Amino acid sequence: MIQEKHLTFTINLLVSLFFLTILIIPKGYNYAPIILSAIGLIYFIPLKKKLSFSSEDKKLIFSFLFYFFTFLLSIIINKDGIREIDNPSRLLLFIPLLLLFKNFPIKRKTILYAIPSSALITGCVALFQKFALGYEKPFPETMHIQMGNIAISLATFSIVITLHFFIKKQYKSTLFGFVAIILAIMTSALSGARGGWIGLPVVVGIILFLYKEFINKKLIITLIAIITIGLTALITSPKFGIEKRYNAAKSDIVSYLEKNNRNTSLGARFDMWENALIAIKEAPIFGHGSDGYDEFRHKQVKSKQMAKTTLNFGSLHNQYLESWVKRGLVGFIALILIILTPIFYFIKNLNTHNLETKCICILGIIHIVSHIFYFTSQSFLAHNSGNIFYFSAMLCFIV
Protein backbone atom coordinates (compact mmCIF):
# COMPACT_ATOMS: atom_id res chain seq x y z
CA MET A 1 0.00 0.00 0.00
CA ILE A 2 1.35 3.42 -0.96
CA GLN A 3 1.95 5.50 2.13
CA GLU A 4 0.06 8.78 2.27
CA LYS A 5 3.26 10.83 2.53
CA HIS A 6 4.49 9.31 -0.73
CA LEU A 7 1.16 10.04 -2.38
CA THR A 8 1.26 13.64 -1.13
CA PHE A 9 4.77 14.04 -2.55
CA THR A 10 3.69 12.58 -5.91
CA ILE A 11 0.65 14.87 -6.11
CA ASN A 12 2.72 17.98 -5.37
CA LEU A 13 5.36 16.91 -7.88
CA LEU A 14 2.73 16.44 -10.60
CA VAL A 15 1.12 19.81 -9.82
CA SER A 16 4.54 21.44 -10.17
CA LEU A 17 5.10 19.65 -13.48
CA PHE A 18 1.69 20.77 -14.73
CA PHE A 19 2.71 24.42 -14.47
CA LEU A 20 6.33 23.85 -15.50
CA THR A 21 5.55 21.89 -18.67
CA ILE A 22 2.30 23.55 -19.73
CA LEU A 23 3.90 25.28 -22.73
CA ILE A 24 7.49 24.09 -23.05
CA ILE A 25 6.52 20.47 -23.85
CA PRO A 26 4.11 19.77 -26.74
CA LYS A 27 0.70 19.10 -25.17
CA GLY A 28 2.38 19.39 -21.77
CA TYR A 29 -0.91 20.61 -20.30
CA ASN A 30 -2.31 17.07 -20.73
CA TYR A 31 0.04 14.78 -18.89
CA ALA A 32 0.01 15.81 -15.22
CA PRO A 33 -3.80 16.31 -14.98
CA ILE A 34 -4.45 12.92 -16.61
CA ILE A 35 -2.08 11.14 -14.21
CA LEU A 36 -3.55 13.00 -11.23
CA SER A 37 -7.08 12.09 -12.31
CA ALA A 38 -6.04 8.45 -12.65
CA ILE A 39 -4.61 8.55 -9.13
CA GLY A 40 -7.89 10.03 -7.92
CA LEU A 41 -9.93 7.29 -9.60
CA ILE A 42 -7.71 4.53 -8.21
CA TYR A 43 -7.70 6.01 -4.73
CA PHE A 44 -11.43 6.58 -4.36
CA ILE A 45 -12.99 3.75 -6.37
CA PRO A 46 -10.96 0.50 -6.13
CA LEU A 47 -9.63 1.34 -2.68
CA LYS A 48 -13.16 2.36 -1.61
CA LYS A 49 -12.04 5.41 0.33
CA LYS A 50 -14.84 7.33 1.96
CA LEU A 51 -16.02 10.28 -0.09
CA SER A 52 -16.94 13.51 1.66
CA PHE A 53 -18.48 16.48 -0.11
CA SER A 54 -18.84 20.00 1.25
CA SER A 55 -21.63 22.20 -0.10
CA GLU A 56 -19.02 24.09 -2.15
CA ASP A 57 -17.77 20.80 -3.60
CA LYS A 58 -21.30 19.83 -4.59
CA LYS A 59 -21.90 23.17 -6.31
CA LEU A 60 -18.65 22.90 -8.22
CA ILE A 61 -19.30 19.30 -9.27
CA PHE A 62 -22.83 20.24 -10.34
CA SER A 63 -21.51 23.08 -12.53
CA PHE A 64 -19.03 20.67 -14.17
CA LEU A 65 -21.69 18.02 -14.81
CA PHE A 66 -24.23 20.55 -16.08
CA TYR A 67 -21.68 22.02 -18.50
CA PHE A 68 -20.91 18.52 -19.82
CA PHE A 69 -24.63 17.69 -19.99
CA THR A 70 -25.27 20.60 -22.40
CA PHE A 71 -22.98 18.96 -24.94
CA LEU A 72 -24.84 15.67 -24.58
CA LEU A 73 -28.11 17.54 -24.98
CA SER A 74 -26.83 19.14 -28.18
CA ILE A 75 -25.99 15.70 -29.58
CA ILE A 76 -29.53 14.52 -28.87
CA ILE A 77 -31.45 17.63 -29.97
CA ASN A 78 -29.21 19.04 -32.70
CA LYS A 79 -27.92 15.65 -33.85
CA ASP A 80 -24.27 16.64 -33.43
CA GLY A 81 -21.63 13.94 -33.82
CA ILE A 82 -20.33 12.07 -30.78
CA ARG A 83 -16.99 13.83 -31.35
CA GLU A 84 -18.54 16.94 -29.76
CA ILE A 85 -18.16 15.46 -26.28
CA ASP A 86 -14.48 14.54 -26.71
CA ASN A 87 -13.20 17.84 -25.31
CA PRO A 88 -15.84 18.46 -22.58
CA SER A 89 -15.67 14.81 -21.46
CA ARG A 90 -12.38 15.71 -19.78
CA LEU A 91 -14.51 17.54 -17.24
CA LEU A 92 -15.50 14.16 -15.82
CA LEU A 93 -11.83 13.56 -15.00
CA PHE A 94 -11.68 16.76 -12.98
CA ILE A 95 -14.19 15.45 -10.43
CA PRO A 96 -11.80 12.80 -8.99
CA LEU A 97 -9.10 15.48 -9.23
CA LEU A 98 -11.15 17.78 -6.99
CA LEU A 99 -11.66 14.98 -4.47
CA LEU A 100 -7.98 14.10 -4.56
CA PHE A 101 -6.92 17.68 -3.81
CA LYS A 102 -9.51 17.90 -1.03
CA ASN A 103 -8.11 14.82 0.69
CA PHE A 104 -4.47 15.58 -0.11
CA PRO A 105 -4.22 19.39 -0.13
CA ILE A 106 -1.52 20.83 -2.34
CA LYS A 107 1.26 22.44 -0.32
CA ARG A 108 1.17 26.22 -0.55
CA LYS A 109 4.88 26.38 -1.40
CA THR A 110 4.30 24.10 -4.38
CA ILE A 111 2.01 26.71 -5.94
CA LEU A 112 4.04 29.72 -4.81
CA TYR A 113 7.27 28.49 -6.39
CA ALA A 114 6.06 26.33 -9.29
CA ILE A 115 4.20 29.18 -11.02
CA PRO A 116 6.98 31.82 -11.13
CA SER A 117 9.45 29.04 -12.00
CA SER A 118 7.18 28.10 -14.90
CA ALA A 119 6.93 31.74 -16.01
CA LEU A 120 10.71 32.13 -15.89
CA ILE A 121 11.56 28.88 -17.69
CA THR A 122 8.81 29.36 -20.27
CA GLY A 123 10.08 32.87 -20.99
CA CYS A 124 13.67 31.71 -21.42
CA VAL A 125 12.62 28.92 -23.80
CA ALA A 126 10.39 31.33 -25.77
CA LEU A 127 13.23 33.84 -26.21
CA PHE A 128 15.61 31.06 -27.25
CA GLN A 129 13.17 29.65 -29.80
CA LYS A 130 12.45 33.09 -31.26
CA PHE A 131 15.89 34.68 -31.38
CA ALA A 132 18.31 31.73 -31.40
CA LEU A 133 16.35 29.14 -33.39
CA GLY A 134 14.54 31.67 -35.56
CA TYR A 135 10.99 30.45 -34.92
CA GLU A 136 8.28 32.76 -36.20
CA LYS A 137 6.49 32.25 -32.88
CA PRO A 138 7.56 30.23 -29.83
CA PHE A 139 5.85 26.95 -28.94
CA PRO A 140 4.37 26.34 -32.42
CA GLU A 141 2.70 23.13 -31.21
CA THR A 142 0.20 25.22 -29.23
CA MET A 143 -2.27 27.52 -31.00
CA HIS A 144 -0.73 31.00 -30.63
CA ILE A 145 -3.79 32.70 -29.09
CA GLN A 146 -4.07 29.96 -26.47
CA MET A 147 -0.35 30.19 -25.78
CA GLY A 148 -0.43 33.97 -25.46
CA ASN A 149 -3.33 33.84 -23.01
CA ILE A 150 -1.73 31.13 -20.87
CA ALA A 151 1.50 33.16 -20.78
CA ILE A 152 -0.43 36.25 -19.62
CA SER A 153 -1.98 34.09 -16.87
CA LEU A 154 1.49 33.00 -15.75
CA ALA A 155 2.46 36.69 -15.64
CA THR A 156 -0.56 37.78 -13.57
CA PHE A 157 -0.17 34.77 -11.26
CA SER A 158 3.47 35.80 -10.78
CA ILE A 159 2.39 39.37 -9.91
CA VAL A 160 0.15 37.99 -7.13
CA ILE A 161 2.89 35.71 -5.81
CA THR A 162 5.58 38.41 -6.04
CA LEU A 163 3.44 40.76 -3.94
CA HIS A 164 2.97 37.93 -1.45
CA PHE A 165 6.75 37.48 -1.22
CA PHE A 166 7.19 41.23 -0.75
CA ILE A 167 4.59 41.36 2.04
CA LYS A 168 6.38 38.45 3.74
CA LYS A 169 9.67 40.36 3.31
CA GLN A 170 11.15 37.53 1.27
CA TYR A 171 13.10 39.90 -0.95
CA LYS A 172 15.14 37.32 -2.88
CA SER A 173 11.94 35.55 -3.85
CA THR A 174 10.42 38.95 -4.72
CA LEU A 175 13.25 39.61 -7.18
CA PHE A 176 12.80 36.11 -8.61
CA GLY A 177 9.11 36.88 -9.08
CA PHE A 178 9.80 40.15 -10.88
CA VAL A 179 12.04 38.38 -13.39
CA ALA A 180 9.32 35.75 -13.87
CA ILE A 181 6.70 38.46 -14.58
CA ILE A 182 8.87 40.12 -17.23
CA LEU A 183 9.66 36.84 -18.99
CA ALA A 184 6.03 35.68 -18.98
CA ILE A 185 4.88 38.99 -20.50
CA MET A 186 7.60 38.67 -23.14
CA THR A 187 6.34 35.18 -23.96
CA SER A 188 2.84 36.50 -24.55
CA ALA A 189 4.20 39.37 -26.63
CA LEU A 190 6.10 36.91 -28.84
CA SER A 191 2.94 34.86 -29.38
CA GLY A 192 1.42 37.57 -31.54
CA ALA A 193 -1.90 37.25 -29.67
CA ARG A 194 -3.70 40.47 -28.72
CA GLY A 195 -6.83 39.35 -26.89
CA GLY A 196 -5.16 38.37 -23.62
CA TRP A 197 -3.83 41.90 -23.11
CA ILE A 198 -7.27 43.53 -23.11
CA GLY A 199 -8.08 42.64 -19.51
CA LEU A 200 -4.54 43.05 -18.14
CA PRO A 201 -5.04 46.57 -16.66
CA VAL A 202 -8.27 45.43 -14.96
CA VAL A 203 -6.64 42.27 -13.60
CA VAL A 204 -3.64 44.20 -12.23
CA GLY A 205 -6.05 46.71 -10.67
CA ILE A 206 -7.97 43.91 -8.93
CA ILE A 207 -4.72 42.40 -7.61
CA LEU A 208 -3.66 45.75 -6.11
CA PHE A 209 -7.14 46.29 -4.65
CA LEU A 210 -7.19 42.86 -2.98
CA TYR A 211 -3.76 43.51 -1.46
CA LYS A 212 -4.47 47.16 -0.57
CA GLU A 213 -4.31 46.61 3.20
CA PHE A 214 -0.78 45.20 2.92
CA ILE A 215 0.86 47.59 0.48
CA ASN A 216 1.21 51.37 0.63
CA LYS A 217 0.54 53.93 -2.08
CA LYS A 218 4.25 54.38 -2.74
CA LEU A 219 4.63 50.70 -3.61
CA ILE A 220 1.50 50.75 -5.79
CA ILE A 221 2.82 53.76 -7.73
CA THR A 222 6.22 52.07 -8.08
CA LEU A 223 4.63 48.85 -9.35
CA ILE A 224 2.44 50.69 -11.85
CA ALA A 225 5.46 52.70 -13.03
CA ILE A 226 7.58 49.55 -13.49
CA ILE A 227 4.80 47.77 -15.37
CA THR A 228 4.13 50.85 -17.53
CA ILE A 229 7.82 51.31 -18.38
CA GLY A 230 8.20 47.60 -19.11
CA LEU A 231 5.14 47.48 -21.36
CA THR A 232 6.23 50.67 -23.15
CA ALA A 233 9.64 49.13 -23.84
CA LEU A 234 7.98 45.99 -25.20
CA ILE A 235 5.50 47.92 -27.32
CA THR A 236 8.13 50.17 -28.89
CA SER A 237 10.58 47.33 -29.60
CA PRO A 238 10.18 46.16 -33.22
CA LYS A 239 11.54 42.72 -32.26
CA PHE A 240 8.29 41.93 -30.44
CA GLY A 241 6.00 43.45 -33.07
CA ILE A 242 3.42 44.72 -30.56
CA GLU A 243 3.14 48.22 -32.05
CA LYS A 244 2.74 46.70 -35.52
CA ARG A 245 -0.08 44.43 -34.32
CA TYR A 246 -1.75 47.33 -32.49
CA ASN A 247 -1.71 49.45 -35.63
CA ALA A 248 -3.06 46.52 -37.66
CA ALA A 249 -5.90 46.05 -35.16
CA LYS A 250 -6.67 49.79 -35.22
CA SER A 251 -6.72 49.75 -39.01
CA ASP A 252 -9.05 46.71 -39.06
CA ILE A 253 -11.50 48.39 -36.68
CA VAL A 254 -11.55 51.70 -38.58
CA SER A 255 -11.91 49.85 -41.89
CA TYR A 256 -14.85 47.85 -40.54
CA LEU A 257 -16.66 50.81 -38.99
CA GLU A 258 -16.14 53.24 -41.86
CA LYS A 259 -16.12 50.95 -44.91
CA ASN A 260 -17.80 47.80 -43.57
CA ASN A 261 -14.67 45.88 -44.60
CA ARG A 262 -15.28 42.33 -43.38
CA ASN A 263 -12.22 40.79 -45.01
CA THR A 264 -9.65 41.73 -42.37
CA SER A 265 -8.79 39.62 -39.31
CA LEU A 266 -10.91 41.68 -36.90
CA GLY A 267 -13.48 42.59 -39.55
CA ALA A 268 -14.25 38.91 -40.12
CA ARG A 269 -14.65 38.38 -36.38
CA PHE A 270 -17.02 41.33 -36.02
CA ASP A 271 -18.99 39.93 -38.94
CA MET A 272 -19.17 36.51 -37.28
CA TRP A 273 -20.36 38.06 -34.03
CA GLU A 274 -23.08 40.09 -35.78
CA ASN A 275 -24.34 36.99 -37.56
CA ALA A 276 -24.09 35.01 -34.33
CA LEU A 277 -26.82 37.23 -32.89
CA ILE A 278 -29.02 36.30 -35.86
CA ALA A 279 -28.25 32.62 -35.25
CA ILE A 280 -29.21 32.99 -31.59
CA LYS A 281 -32.58 34.49 -32.53
CA GLU A 282 -33.26 31.48 -34.77
CA ALA A 283 -32.53 28.88 -32.06
CA PRO A 284 -32.39 30.65 -28.68
CA ILE A 285 -32.98 27.78 -26.23
CA PHE A 286 -30.96 24.79 -27.46
CA GLY A 287 -28.86 26.42 -30.19
CA HIS A 288 -27.92 25.09 -33.61
CA GLY A 289 -25.25 22.58 -32.61
CA SER A 290 -21.85 22.57 -34.33
CA ASP A 291 -23.09 21.07 -37.59
CA GLY A 292 -26.15 23.30 -37.57
CA TYR A 293 -24.03 26.41 -37.11
CA ASP A 294 -21.82 25.37 -40.05
CA GLU A 295 -24.96 25.10 -42.17
CA PHE A 296 -26.13 28.50 -40.90
CA ARG A 297 -22.92 30.33 -41.77
CA HIS A 298 -22.71 28.73 -45.24
CA LYS A 299 -26.29 29.92 -45.78
CA GLN A 300 -25.32 33.43 -44.64
CA VAL A 301 -22.26 33.48 -46.89
CA LYS A 302 -24.32 32.27 -49.86
CA SER A 303 -26.83 35.08 -49.30
CA LYS A 304 -23.90 37.53 -48.89
CA GLN A 305 -24.96 38.49 -45.38
CA MET A 306 -21.69 37.10 -44.06
CA ALA A 307 -18.18 37.45 -45.51
CA LYS A 308 -16.63 34.39 -47.13
CA THR A 309 -13.47 34.97 -45.06
CA THR A 310 -15.39 33.90 -41.94
CA LEU A 311 -15.37 30.32 -43.24
CA ASN A 312 -11.62 30.25 -42.53
CA PHE A 313 -12.32 30.40 -38.79
CA GLY A 314 -12.87 27.15 -36.91
CA SER A 315 -14.72 28.90 -34.09
CA LEU A 316 -16.53 32.15 -33.33
CA HIS A 317 -13.55 33.53 -31.37
CA ASN A 318 -15.92 34.36 -28.52
CA GLN A 319 -16.71 31.74 -25.88
CA TYR A 320 -19.98 33.37 -24.83
CA LEU A 321 -21.40 33.51 -28.36
CA GLU A 322 -19.98 30.07 -29.16
CA SER A 323 -21.84 28.54 -26.22
CA TRP A 324 -25.14 30.26 -27.00
CA VAL A 325 -25.07 29.75 -30.78
CA LYS A 326 -24.21 26.04 -30.56
CA ARG A 327 -25.93 25.01 -27.30
CA GLY A 328 -28.46 27.77 -26.80
CA LEU A 329 -29.43 29.57 -23.61
CA VAL A 330 -28.88 26.27 -21.77
CA GLY A 331 -25.25 26.21 -22.92
CA PHE A 332 -24.73 29.87 -22.08
CA ILE A 333 -26.08 29.35 -18.54
CA ALA A 334 -23.74 26.37 -18.13
CA LEU A 335 -20.79 28.55 -19.15
CA ILE A 336 -21.78 31.25 -16.66
CA LEU A 337 -22.07 28.58 -13.94
CA ILE A 338 -18.49 27.35 -14.45
CA ILE A 339 -17.39 30.98 -14.14
CA LEU A 340 -19.47 32.15 -11.17
CA THR A 341 -19.38 29.00 -9.02
CA PRO A 342 -15.59 28.96 -8.55
CA ILE A 343 -15.20 32.74 -8.29
CA PHE A 344 -17.79 32.91 -5.49
CA TYR A 345 -15.90 30.09 -3.76
CA PHE A 346 -12.62 32.03 -3.92
CA ILE A 347 -14.25 35.29 -2.78
CA LYS A 348 -15.87 33.49 0.18
CA ASN A 349 -12.50 32.13 1.33
CA LEU A 350 -10.63 35.38 0.74
CA ASN A 351 -11.32 36.80 4.20
CA THR A 352 -8.52 35.10 6.11
CA HIS A 353 -5.51 36.18 8.16
CA ASN A 354 -3.38 33.41 6.66
CA LEU A 355 -1.32 35.14 3.96
CA GLU A 356 -0.63 31.93 2.03
CA THR A 357 -4.33 31.04 1.88
CA LYS A 358 -5.19 34.61 0.89
CA CYS A 359 -2.61 34.50 -1.89
CA ILE A 360 -4.01 31.23 -3.28
CA CYS A 361 -7.57 32.64 -3.21
CA ILE A 362 -6.43 35.76 -5.06
CA LEU A 363 -4.79 33.49 -7.64
CA GLY A 364 -8.15 31.77 -8.06
CA ILE A 365 -10.02 35.05 -8.49
CA ILE A 366 -7.48 36.37 -10.98
CA HIS A 367 -7.59 33.08 -12.90
CA ILE A 368 -11.35 33.34 -13.40
CA VAL A 369 -11.38 37.09 -14.11
CA SER A 370 -8.62 36.69 -16.70
CA HIS A 371 -10.64 34.03 -18.49
CA ILE A 372 -13.72 36.23 -18.48
CA PHE A 373 -11.67 38.51 -20.74
CA TYR A 374 -10.09 35.67 -22.74
CA PHE A 375 -13.57 34.40 -23.55
CA THR A 376 -14.50 37.69 -25.25
CA SER A 377 -11.96 37.28 -28.07
CA GLN A 378 -11.36 33.54 -28.20
CA SER A 379 -13.37 30.32 -27.89
CA PHE A 380 -10.82 29.35 -25.26
CA LEU A 381 -12.54 26.22 -23.97
CA ALA A 382 -13.02 24.82 -27.47
CA HIS A 383 -9.32 23.90 -27.41
CA ASN A 384 -7.94 21.11 -25.23
CA SER A 385 -5.19 23.45 -23.99
CA GLY A 386 -7.73 26.02 -22.77
CA ASN A 387 -10.16 23.48 -21.36
CA ILE A 388 -7.51 21.67 -19.32
CA PHE A 389 -5.70 24.84 -18.22
CA TYR A 390 -8.89 26.54 -17.04
CA PHE A 391 -10.20 23.66 -14.95
CA SER A 392 -6.88 22.20 -13.75
CA ALA A 393 -5.49 25.53 -12.54
CA MET A 394 -8.84 26.35 -10.93
CA LEU A 395 -8.76 23.11 -8.93
CA CYS A 396 -5.14 23.72 -7.90
CA PHE A 397 -6.31 26.94 -6.23
CA ILE A 398 -9.21 25.34 -4.33
CA VAL A 399 -8.16 25.60 -0.68
From Swiss-Prot:
It is found in: Cell membrane. Keywords: Cell membrane, Membrane, Transmembrane, Transmembrane helix. The keyword Membrane applies. Pfam families: Wzy_C. It is a multi-pass membrane protein. Its main location: membrane. The chain crosses the membrane at residues 6-26, 27-47, 60-80, 111-131, 147-167, 173-193, 195-215, 220-240, 328-348, 362-382. GO terms for cellular component: plasma membrane. PANTHER family: O-ANTIGEN LIGASE, TEICHURONIC ACID BIOSYNTHESIS PROTEIN TUAE. This is Uncharacterized protein HI_0874.
